């Protein structure tokens, strides 16, 4: 005969989702044109995912001009490659799709892990010490907003 343990059932407590996304969203989704978007991705940026995520959280759901102003004033090293990426995405939108930069809106800004560059540093007594430099992929999606 198999014996069973009686375990007291503990209900899971749901975490409250932060309201930052709702607060940061300034344009209702019905005003965003669904198929009028521009994707721009940059691969293998030599930067930690967490450092890039800190900057991307600030620019998500903002207009292009506001984003450029924020990125220029941010004191983080991660803001410069992201600024170049946003500039490039906006240039692609105006050149290839004839969008106006004043109506561009960042709907998606995400970062993902990439490869880790491994090097060795010489240490005392002929030993070596590994150095791991992490990299990341960053994707920006710009959407056009309808005039109201």
From Swiss-Prot:
GO cellular component: chloroplast; large ribosomal subunit
Superkingdom field: Eukaryota
Keywords (A to Z) from UniProt: Chloroplast, Plastid, Ribonucleoprotein, Ribosomal protein, RNA-binding, rRNA-binding
Gene3D superfamilies: Ribosomal protein L22/L17
Compartments where found: Plastid, Chloroplast
Gene Ontology process terms (BP): translation
Gene Ontology molecular function: rRNA binding; structural constituent of ribosome
InterPro entries referenced in this protein's UniProt entry, alphabetically: Ribosomal_uL22, Ribosomal_uL22_bac/chlpt-type, Ribosomal_uL22_bac/org-type, Ribosomal_uL22_CS, Ribosomal_uL22_sf
PROSITE patterns cross-referenced by the UniProt entry: RIBOSOMAL_L22
Family statement drawn from the similarity comment of this UniProt entry: Belongs to the universal ribosomal protein uL22 family.
NCBIfam families recorded: rplV_bact
Function: This protein binds specifically to 23S rRNA. The globular domain of the protein is located near the polypeptide exit tunnel on the outside of the subunit, while an extended beta-hairpin is found that lines the wall of the exit tunnel in the center of the 70S ribosome.
Subunit structure: Part of the 50S ribosomal subunit.
Protein name in the entry: Large ribosomal subunit protein uL22c
Gene designation per UniProt: rpl22
């Amino acid at each position: 005969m198999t014996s069973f343990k009686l375990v007291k059932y503990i209900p899971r407590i749901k975490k409250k989702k932060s309201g930052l996304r709702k607060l940061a969203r300034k344009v209702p989704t019905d005003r965003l044109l669904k198929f009028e978007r521009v994707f721009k991705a940059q691969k293998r940026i030599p930067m930690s995912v967490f450092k890039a995520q800190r900057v991307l959280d600030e620019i998500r759901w903002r207009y292009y001009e506001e984003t450029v102003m924020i990125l220029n004033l941010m004191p983080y090293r991660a803001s410069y490659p992201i600024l170049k990426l946003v500039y490039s995405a906006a240039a692609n939108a105006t050149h290839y799709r004839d969008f106006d930069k004043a109506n561009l809106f960042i709907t998606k800004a995400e970062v993902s892990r990439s490869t880790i560059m491994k090097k060795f540093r010489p240490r005392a007594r002929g030993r070596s010490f590994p150095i791991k430099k992490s990299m990341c992929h960053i994707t920006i999606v710009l959407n056009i907003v309808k005039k109201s």
